[in-house]
């Protein structure tokens, strides 16, 4: 079985800031971003890592960062461990394939969510109010149906363990400023459209996703964090797509479904996950990487 990394311990580096999945090391003039194999569902970190998950997330993100270069710059400096600062290279066996040296930027204060299909919380909202995040939709939509128009539905950025809160575009404009909000919306829709079209050709429907952006010292908005991964997006197999029901997926929806089945209360600590759930989730992540990126970004 593949080895897994629950959290990184790199003694010669500063103490990292740990998020749900990533450990961020402040190296002074750059960050070392390491994707662990932690998995969170319903904003709760599960106690069992998914082997190789962090590597898959990193390689998929690197693939998309490259694909999207003509739309927006990104924060990647290098993903080659032998180009990292010398003090990092001793940890090559841990860092290889799951880490990126990234530029320091000021993160934007909102999450940029894009929805191309109606699913998850969007579907729940539609059933109650025929709207998603305050945006009215036509009646008669089925679960998992392609939306008449791709939606930009921003949210607040919650602290670890808290829930992101959906907000209107107007509220987003209040938080980041009208001009920046428009720029974030336009970039998000452009990236999603290009990504969804390319993924569709490779047999994956990207139902929805979440982007993060940052601002450089010279005022440019760039793409940061992760891009169109099974953690930040809903990936559905195109050959099994059937509107009117919840879809099979390449992402952690498999874990979410299991947690709903056991009536998990969505409060920490997360429950132990059965080996079968861990294995199947790992397989789904690997399958998504292979379909999207082929062998160029294999782990």
Swiss-Prot record:
<comment type="pathway">
    <text>Purine metabolism; IMP biosynthesis via de novo pathway; 5-amino-1-(5-phospho-D-ribosyl)imidazole-4-carboxamide from 5-amino-1-(5-phospho-D-ribosyl)imidazole-4-carboxylate: step 1/2.</text>
</comment>
<dbReference type="GO" id="GO:0004639">
    <property type="term" value="F:phosphoribosylaminoimidazolesuccinocarboxamide synthase activity"/>
</dbReference>
<dbReference type="GO" id="GO:0005524">
    <property type="term" value="F:ATP binding"/>
</dbReference>
<keyword id="KW-0658">Purine biosynthesis</keyword>
<keyword id="KW-0436">Ligase</keyword>
<keyword id="KW-0067">ATP-binding</keyword>
<dbReference type="InterPro" id="IPR028923">
    <property type="entry name" value="SAICAR_synt/ADE2_N"/>
</dbReference>
<keyword id="KW-0547">Nucleotide-binding</keyword>
<dbReference type="GO" id="GO:0005737">
    <property type="term" value="C:cytoplasm"/>
</dbReference>
<dbReference type="Pfam" id="PF01259">
    <property type="entry name" value="SAICAR_synt"/>
</dbReference>
<dbReference type="InterPro" id="IPR001636">
    <property type="entry name" value="SAICAR_synth"/>
</dbReference>
<comment type="similarity">
    <text>Belongs to the SAICAR synthetase family.</text>
</comment>
<dbReference type="InterPro" id="IPR018236">
    <property type="entry name" value="SAICAR_synthetase_CS"/>
</dbReference>
<protein>
    <recommendedName>
        <fullName>Phosphoribosylaminoimidazole-succinocarboxamide synthase</fullName>
        <ecNumber>6.3.2.6</ecNumber>
    </recommendedName>
</protein>
<dbReference type="GO" id="GO:0006189">
    <property type="term" value="P:'de novo' IMP biosynthetic process"/>
</dbReference>
């Amino acid at each position: 079985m593949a080895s897994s990394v629950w959290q990184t311990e790199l003694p010669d580096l500063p103490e990292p800031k740990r998020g749900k999945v990533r450990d961020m090391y402040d190296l002074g003039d750059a960050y070392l971003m390491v994707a662990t194999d932690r998995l969170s569902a319903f904003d709760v970190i599960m106690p069992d890592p998914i082997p190789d998950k962090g590597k898959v997330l990193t390689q998929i993100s690197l693939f998309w960062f490259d694909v999207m270069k003509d739309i927006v710059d990104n924060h990647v400096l290098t993903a080659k461990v032998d180009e990292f600062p010398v003090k990092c290279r001793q940890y090559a066996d841990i860092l290889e394939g799951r880490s990126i040296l990234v530029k320091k930027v000021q993160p934007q204060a909102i999450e940029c969510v894009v929805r191309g299909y109606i699913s998850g919380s969007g579907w729940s909202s539609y059933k109650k109010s025929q709207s998603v995040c305050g945006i009215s939709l036509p009646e008669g939509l089925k679960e998992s149906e392609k939306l008449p128009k791709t939606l930009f539905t921003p949210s607040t950025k919650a602290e670890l363990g808290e829930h992101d809160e959906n907000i209107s575009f107007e509220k987003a404009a209040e938080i980041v400023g009208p001009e920046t909000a428009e720029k974030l919306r336009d970039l998000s829709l452009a990236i999603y459209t290009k990504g969804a079209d390319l993924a569709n050709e490779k047999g994956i429907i990207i139902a929805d996703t979440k982007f993060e952006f940052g601002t450089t010292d010279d005022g440019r908005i760039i793409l940061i964090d992760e891009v169109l991964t099974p953690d930040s997006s809903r990936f559905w197999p195109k050959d099994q797509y059937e509107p009117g029901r919840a879809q099979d997926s390449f992402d952690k929806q498999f874990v979410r479904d299991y947690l709903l089945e056991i009536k998990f209360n969505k409060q920490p600590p997360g429950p132990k996950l059965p080996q079968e759930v861990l294995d199947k989730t790992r397989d789904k992540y690997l399958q998504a990487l292979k379909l999207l990126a082929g062998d160029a970004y294999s782990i």
